[in-house]
């Protein structure tokens, strides 16, 4: 696919790059990992001031509409700079509320999301329901939950859970668990919660939200991979062995070239998924909200596009992380070196919102594996 951003979209990306480059994102990530979200929330507010979160919020709720291409531009930069927090989940929750079309929860949360003042964690049971008579809608238990994990549930302002055909606001969470990325901590939403909506429309909106989450994770991974590659190129130009820069060795060049090719192949898939999401959203709005055969077929095609982008970008970023670690040596995974933050993030993003095997199954077999 040949895809060119317009001047306004490119300038938007450059503006985000400059703003995030001037901020101490690495410091914010390290603070977030020990539950000090203050520096990270300041970054979130600056992102909101530039309109990032408004890109998923309808105009009637102080947003810009749903603009997947601009979201891809933004999330590549968020991944490049390693912005902490549930950025994917917050935007996916906004997409869920927008697609659901229920005015009450939309008015309650969307303006705050657009303004950057409301962090949302989001978990989805992918159509599974509790088999004990519905007493535990989240798949959890009274002791703290055993359903799907929610990223940063302990620091988010709100945690949404889709369980079967119900959308709930969780009342709490279970024990906080570490992950490969110290700034991405996980917890299972607690038993019960406020029911915000129910019915087939919830499942349809949830499918869309999960697609958006996978798509944004792919964009983040692409940005993280590019950062890892750029930092490694800089390093091998500086490090010397036998009196010459190690970057002059053919084996090193080939390793970096492989990483670059993978990232270059992933980029059109990410933006292709953005175009597909934009087209699907426009068609959905033209025919009105609801379940229709044509809409279901279009949505399935979009999910395959998103899955292709997710597996390509996730594997490319992971490959860049492996190359970065190999060429930096043992210093690459030390906590003191910022590179380790991106290495760990790339590994976590690889499996977030769809593992490589799940995404490949969807692309190759057309399997709707999440639902």
Predicted feature locations:
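Amphipathic alpha-helical regulatory segments at dimerization interfaces
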Residues: 22, 46, 96-99, 109-112
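Alpha-helical interface subdomain recognition
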Residues: 1-79, 116, 136, 211-371
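N-terminal glycine-rich flavin-associated loop
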Residues: 85-103
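Short, charge-rich binding segments
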Residues: 76-77, 86, 98-99, 111-113, ...
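Short beta-strands and strand-loop turn motifs
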Residues: 55-57, 88-91, 121-123, 166, ...
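Alpha-helix C-terminal capping segments
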Residues: 23, 77-78, 97, 159-162, ...
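FAD-binding core of flavoproteins
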Residues: 104-230, 234
């Amino acid at each position: 696919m040949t895809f060119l951003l317009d001047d306004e979209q490119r300038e938007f990306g450059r503006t985000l790059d400059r703003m995030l480059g001037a901020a101490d994102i690495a410091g914010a990530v390290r603070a977030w990992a020990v539950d000090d979200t203050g520096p990270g929330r300041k970054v979130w507010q600056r992102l909101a001031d530039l309109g990032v979160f408004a890109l998923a919020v309808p105009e009637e709720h102080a947003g810009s509409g749903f603009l997947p291409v601009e979201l891809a531009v933004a999330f590549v930069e968020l991944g490049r700079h390693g912005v902490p927090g549930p950025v994917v989940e917050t935007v996916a929750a906004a997409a869920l509320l927008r697609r659901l079309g229920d005015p009450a929860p939309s008015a309650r949360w969307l303006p705050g999301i657009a303004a950057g003042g409301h962090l949302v964690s989001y978990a989805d049971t992918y159509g599974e329901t509790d088999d004990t008579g519905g007493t535990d809608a989240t798949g959890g238990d009274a002791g703290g939950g055993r359903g799907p994990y929610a990223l940063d549930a302990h620091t988010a302002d709100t945690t949404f859970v889709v369980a079967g055909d119900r959308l709930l606001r969780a009342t709490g969470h279970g024990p906080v668990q570490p992950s490969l990325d110290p700034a991405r901590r996980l917890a299972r939403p607690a038993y019960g919660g406020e029911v915000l909506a129910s019915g087939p429309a919830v499942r349809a909106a949830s499918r869309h939200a999960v697609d958006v989450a996978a798509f944004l994770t792919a964009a983040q991974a692409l940005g993280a991979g590019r950062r890892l590659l750029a930092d490694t190129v800089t390093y091998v130009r500086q490090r010397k062995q036998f009196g010459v820069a190690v970057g002059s060795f053919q084996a090193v060049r080939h390793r970096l070239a492989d990483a670059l090719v993978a990232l270059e192949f992933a980029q059109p898939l990410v933006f292709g998924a953005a175009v597909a999401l934009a087209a699907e959203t426009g068609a959905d709005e033209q025919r009105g909200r609801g379940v229709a055969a044509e809409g279901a077929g279009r949505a399935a095609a979009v999910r395959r596009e998103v899955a292709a982008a997710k597996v390509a970008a996730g594997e490319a970023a992971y490959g860049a992380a492996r190359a970065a670690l190999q060429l930096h040596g043992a210093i690459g995974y030390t906590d003191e070196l910022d590179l380790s933050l991106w290495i760990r993030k790339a590994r976590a993003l690889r499996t977030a919102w769809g593992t490589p095997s799940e995404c490949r199954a969807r692309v190759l077999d057309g399997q709707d594996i999440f639902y």
